[in-house]
A protein has these predicted regions:
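Outer-membrane beta-barrel initiation region
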Residues: 142, 147-196
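Signature of short aromatic-glycine-proline-rich micro-motifs recurring in repeat-based ectodomains
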Residues: 116-129
Length: 196
C-alpha cells in the first residue's frame, strides 16, 4: 500500500483525527500569525483541517493564540471536540463546524491533562455519545467518561487580547536561574539584525 505525506512544510502538525466521512482530517498545528521561522517564534497550537483529496489546509480560529489540542470529530462530522486552556485551565470544548458556536463540555478545577503539555487526553467514542478524558487529581491520573447528550451552554469568546489579561494564571517563575529558559524567553538573542 502507498504512503502519502499530506503536509509538507515547516509547521508542527500533530494529533490527526479523521472525520466520519473520511474526507477531512482535523489536527493540531503551530500555524498562525505568531509563527515566524526567521525569528524562531511560534504560535500556540491551533486547530486545523486538511481536505484529503485536495491537500488544502485551513486553520480554525477559536480562542486566539492559546493552546488548542486533541481534536476529535463528533459522530455527525459537524462538530469538533478539543482541549483548550483559554481561561488558564485545560478543558474540553465543542465547536459547531456549521455555525461556529462554542460550548464548554468540562469545567474542572484541575483541568483535563495528559502526562505532558501536548499529550492527548480526550477521546470521543463513535456512536455512543460518550467522551473519555484524563484528569490529574488526588496525586494520580484518572480516566472519566461523560455523556454528550443534551444542549451544552454556549460560551463567550473574548476577541480582545487586553480583555483576556485577567483570565490566565500568572506565569510561573523558575526556582533558580536557567540560561536555557532565558534564551527561550527571548528568541532574538544571538541572532543577526534582520537588515543584514
Amino acid at each position: 500500500s502507498e504512503t502519502i505525506q499530506l503536509t509538507q512544510d515547516k509547521y508542527a502538525d500533530l494529533q490527526p483525527s479523521w472525520s466520519p466521512d473520511g474526507r477531512t482530517i482535523a489536527f493540531t498545528s503551530d500555524r498562525g500569525a505568531a509563527t515566524n521561522f526567521e525569528l524562531l517564534t511560534y504560535n500556540s497550537f491551533q486547530l486545523a483541517m486538511i481536505e484529503v483529496a485536495t491537500g488544502e489546509v485551513r486553520t480554525i480560529p477559536v480562542f486566539g493564540n492559546v493552546k488548542h489540542i486533541n481534536p476529535q470529530f463528533g459522530d455527525d462530522g459537524e462538530s469538533l471536540y478539543f482541549i483548550s486552556d483559554q481561561d488558564g485551565f485545560s478543558d474540553v470544548y465543542k465547536l459547531s463546524l456549521e455555525d461556529g458556536r462554542i460550548s464548554r463540555v468540562t469545567n474542572l478545577a484541575t483541568g483535563v491533562s495528559g502526562h505532558t503539555y501536548l499529550a492527548p487526553a480526550m477521546s470521543v467514542a463513535p456512536g455512543s455519545g460518550l467522551i473519555a478524558y484524563t484528569v490529574f487529581d488526588e496525586l494520580e491520573f484518572h480516566v472519566y467518561t461523560k455523556e454528550l447528550d443534551g444542549e451544552l451552554p454556549e460560551i463567550l469568546v473574548v476577541e480582545n487580547a487586553e480583555d483576556q489579561l485577567g483570565r490566565k494564571l500568572p506565569p510561573t517563575m523558575p526556582d533558580r536561574f536557567s540560561r536555557i529558559a532565558t534564551y527561550l524567553a527571548d528568541a532574538e538573542t544571538g541572532l543577526l539584525p534582520s537588515n543584514t
